[in-house]
């Protein structure tokens, strides 16, 4: 199995009942599914993982898989195959996940445990140099002086893939809402590559496969530049991307103009989804054929949003990019 193996027989269409959770198509797109853990599942999970504080998950990486197994067992071992099937399915590849009863910032540690369990049923989350852990928590406020658009509230954070400036493969991205106060706007933005009307034009351009330099600002704590093309293909020849407009460094006029046009074509796509993510919920997407970003917020002096992210590789994948390793 590879990271983009075609998977048929859509689980939502089959009418199958699941133990411990429900699964429905989202209001925004049939590609994005909503998975909700029942109140009983949530309660039992939190009780069974209560002996391990988040610090234990940070220090002992095998515990991240242990809590994943606990969650899967509570779901009659139906959860892990469903997660993998959805994320590896090119026609879907995205989930909005919620646990009934987890919806307040006071439960932040419980949120980290739940997200960790889910992520480690599909693979392993990479070391995040920005935080020094396998996950990162960060806050968006009304005023920001950071060196990237990650925390800037009053502008759109453009659509991009994660992991463009590191050497580790980034198959999945998990983005969780921990807290939100005095907030209007700021929906998550998603674009599936196959819904991008300009994909064929840019994928077939001569510069699409040229290795380009990606360099991160100081806040990312990554000092080494990496080189890779914007586009690649999976084993079936379908396009995948590793792109972010902030960190790609064109070497000449030709690359700069092409990248600028590429950015404009992505940001004006009619296929972009706007997805509200309430506190306690998280998005889990296939990073190779979904781009993600964030809409702007309405200014407020006490605006606050806290997020948690994890990004990593599918443990069940053997090949990620067909031509560029």
Curated annotation (Swiss-Prot):
EC number(s) from the headed UniProt entry: 1.14.11.64
Key words, A-Z: Dioxygenase, Iron, Metal-binding, Oxidoreductase
GO molecular function: ferrous iron binding; glutarate dioxygenase activity; oxidoreductase activity, acting on paired donors, with incorporation or reduction of molecular oxygen, with 2-oxoglutarate as one donor, and the other dehydrogenated
A UniProt-annotated Pfam family: CsiD
Chain sites annotated for binding Fe cation: 160, 162, 292
Keyword Iron: yes
Note accompanying the cofactor annotation: Binds 1 Fe(2+) ion per subunit.
UniProt cofactor(s): Fe(2+)
Domain of life: Bacteria
Pathway: Amino-acid degradation
Cited InterPro entries: GlaH, TauD-like_sf
Gene Ontology biological process terms from the UniProt entry: L-lysine catabolic process
Metal-binding listed as a keyword: yes
Catalysed reaction equations from the record: glutarate + 2-oxoglutarate + O2 = (S)-2-hydroxyglutarate + succinate + CO2
Matching CDD domains: CAS_like
Subunit structure: Homotetramer.
Family: Belongs to the glutarate hydroxylase family.
Function as written in the Swiss-Prot or TrEMBL entry: Acts as an alpha-ketoglutarate-dependent dioxygenase catalyzing hydroxylation of glutarate (GA) to L-2-hydroxyglutarate (L2HG). Functions in a L-lysine degradation pathway that proceeds via cadaverine, glutarate and L-2-hydroxyglutarate.
Name recorded for this polypeptide: Glutarate 2-hydroxylase
Organism in which the protein naturally occurs: Escherichia coli O139:H28 (strain E24377A / ETEC)
């Amino acid at each position: 199995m590879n990271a983009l193996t075609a998977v048929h027989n859509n689980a939502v269409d089959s009418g199958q009942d699941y133990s411990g959770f429900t699964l429905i198509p989202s209001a925004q797109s049939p590609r994005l599914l909503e998975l909700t853990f029942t109140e009983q599942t949530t309660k039992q999970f939190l009780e069974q993982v209560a002996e391990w504080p988040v610090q234990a998950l940070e220090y002992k990486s095998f515990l991240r898989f242990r809590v994943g197994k606990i969650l899967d067992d509570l779901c009659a071992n139906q959860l892990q195959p469903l997660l993998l099937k959805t994320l590896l399915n090119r026609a879907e590849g995205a989930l909005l996940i919620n646990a009934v009863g987890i919806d307040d910032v006071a439960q932040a540690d419980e949120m980290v445990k739940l997200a960790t369990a889910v992520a480690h049923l599909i693979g392993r989350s990479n070391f995040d140099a920005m935080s020094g852990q396998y996950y990162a928590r960060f806050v968006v406020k009304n005023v920001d002086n950071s060196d990237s658009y990650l925390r800037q509230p009053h502008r759109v954070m453009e659509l991009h893939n994660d992991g463009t400036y590191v050497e580790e493969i980034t198959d999945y991205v998990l983005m969780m809402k921990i807290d939100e106060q005095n907030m209007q706007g700021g929906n998550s933005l998603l674009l599936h590559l196959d819904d991008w009307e300009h994909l064929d034009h840019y994928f077939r351009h001569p510069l699409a496969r040229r290795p380009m330099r990606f360099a991160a600002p100081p806040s990312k704590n990554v000092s080494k530049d990496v080189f890779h093309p914007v586009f690649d293909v999976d084993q079936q020849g379908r396009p995948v991307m590793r792109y972010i407009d902030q960190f790609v460094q064109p070497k000449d006029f030709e690359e700069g103009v092409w990248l600028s046009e590429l950015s404009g074509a992505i940001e004006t796509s009619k296929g972009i989804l706007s997805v509200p993510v309430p506190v306690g919920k998280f998005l889990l997407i296939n990073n190779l054929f979904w781009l993600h970003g964030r809409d702007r917020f309405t200014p407020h002096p006490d605006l606050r949003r806290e997020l948690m992210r994890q990004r990593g590789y599918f443990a069940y994948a053997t090949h990620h990019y067909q031509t560029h390793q």
